[in-house]
From Swiss-Prot:
Similarity comment: Belongs to the class-I aminoacyl-tRNA synthetase family. TyrS type 1 subfamily.
Official protein name in the record: Tyrosine--tRNA ligase
PROSITE patterns assigned to the protein according to its UniProt record, in alphabetical order: S4
Catalytic activity entry: tRNA(Tyr) + L-tyrosine + ATP = L-tyrosyl-tRNA(Tyr) + AMP + diphosphate + H(+)
NCBIfam families: tyrS (TIGR00234)
Designated gene of the protein: tyrS
Length: 433
């Protein structure tokens, strides 16, 4: 099975150019491929995982990935999928953002010894001379064809229109492909479905200038079963940078996956074998919740390392309760499977508050405690939450808004508060307190 077959089976592929030729090439020889990453933020987010994982699969199957960071094109701004012009950013900001992106990509891709490359297109774009570029590159582009591209057509039909600086973006991205093909023998560009027009333009430019056949592959737009974009929550984006989204919150994002998405997300966002993932489609109930835990653990392990994943899994056990993970469920995962081995200690990454026995001795009104720990914005909101049946202590519904949380509620030196279905906070009483 070639890497193209693997990507197809796991759900990465929406469209190819020259499909059979590409399949044959990938099956017969090592292929150098590239994907571009936008340096408009200091961190990539979950929405970038599909292209990152695709590069990782390429490398794991003997091919050489190139991660191109758009230090040059980022100064222009890609109009694809945008209804208005992006805010232009400074070269200094782009350079700082590239450093953060490189650190994150290194979690997924091995750059040691030339096994993969990270390049910055500012190295060749910022030194281009305008007139020679128009004569040597611009002459190969038809404006009539360019404005038929989806990314340009949408903007031309919008109220804001398309700026001249953005109109040049397709030429610059096509030039990237030409440069990487000539200098690095790169023959495959991959990207999101909104990049189809830019990718095809690059393929055409390489053919005209170098007389070489190169290829393109695009990914589908990945949404949840409810239609939401990947990586977006009520609290904002889910970042790959641990300083912006903690490993615990990252783990929680994945464990809250909808039932219908579990098998699909295991295919896309972990490296677990497909035969094991296919079995997940046949399970339900508690086993499906265990599969979500495996998804969360594996996704966190890949992005943040094994230690962070184990700690996030342990912290979740403290807040949500321990569970055994069946040995025959996704057996290739390294997730701790014995409930007795998880949740043994609280690291401080899970939401928690320390209290003394003295504070609990007389009891604290539940609505006051819910407000104090941040499970409600006000005491009035906390009262309403409890009155409507949404307040819990140790998974036991609070029947009255006059209920007082006390030492009698302690379970193994902890009290777990819950607001609604998914918001938890742990009260921890340390020994000797």
């Amino acid at each position: 099975m070639s890497v193209v077959d693997i990507l197809s089976e796991r759900g990465f592929v929406e469209a190819f150019t020259h499909e059979q030729e590409l399949r044959d090439l990938a099956a017969e020889s090592a292929v150098t491929c590239y994907i571009g990453f936008d340096p408009t933020a200091s961190s990539l987010h979950v929405g970038s995982l599909v292209p990152i994982m695709a590069l990782a699969h390429m490398q794991r199957n003997g091919h050489r990935p190139i991660a191109l960071v758009g230090g040059g094109t980022g100064l222009v701004g890609d109009p694809s999928g945008k209804t208005e012009m992006r805010q232009l950013i400074t070269p200094e900001t782009v350079e700082a953002n590239i450093e953060g992106i490189q650190r994150q990509l290194s979690r997924f891709i091995d750059f040691d010894g030339g096994k993969a490359l990270l390049v910055n297109n500012a190295d060749w774009l910022t030194g281009l001379e305008y007139i020679p570029f128009l004569r040597d590159i611009g002459r190969h582009f038809s404006v009539n064809r360019m404005i038929k591209a989806e990314s340009y057509r949408m903007r031309l039909e919008s109220e804001e229109g398309l700026s001249f600086i953005e109109f040049n973006y397709m030429l610059l991205q096509a030039y990237d492909f030409l440069k990487l093909c000539g200098d690095r023998d790169c023959v495959l560009q991959m990207g999101g479905s909104d990049q189809w027009g830019n990718i095809v333009a690059g393929i055409d430019l390489v053919r005209r200038v170098l007389n070489r056949q190169v290829y393109g592959l695009t990914f589908p737009l990945i949404t949840t079963s409810s239609g939401a974009k990947m990586g977006k929550t009520a609290a904002g984006a889910v970042w790959l940078d641990a300083e912006r989204t903690s490993p615990y919150d990252y783990y929680q994002y994945w464990i809250n996956t909808d039932d219908q998405d579990v098998a699909r997300f295991l295919s896309l966002f972990t490296f677990l074998p497909m035969p094991e993932i296919q079995e997940v489609k046949r399970i339900s109930g508690a086993d499906l919740n265990s599969a979500k835990a495996v998804l969360a653990f594996e996704a966190t392990r890949i992005a943040h390392g094994t230690d962070a994943a184990v700690q996030a899994h342990s912290d979740a056990a403290v807040n949500f309760g321990r569970r055994d993970i069946p040995q025959d469920l996704l057996p290739s995962s390294t997730i701790p499977r014995d409930a007795e081995g998880t949740g043994a200690a609280v690291s401080g990454t899970a939401p928690q508050t320390e209290m003394t026995m003295a504070e609990l001795s007389e009891g604290i009104p539940a609505f006051v405690l819910f407000h104090t720990v941040g499970l409600a914005d006000s005491k009035g909101q906390a009262r309403r939450l409890i009155q409507q049946g949404g307040g819990y202590v140790n998974d036991r519904r609070i029947e009255s808004d006059e209920y007082r949380v006390s030492a009698e509620d302690l379970d193994d030196a902890k009290i777990v508060l819950r607001a609604g279905k998914k918001r938890y906070h742990t009260i921890v009483v340390r020994k000797g307190a």
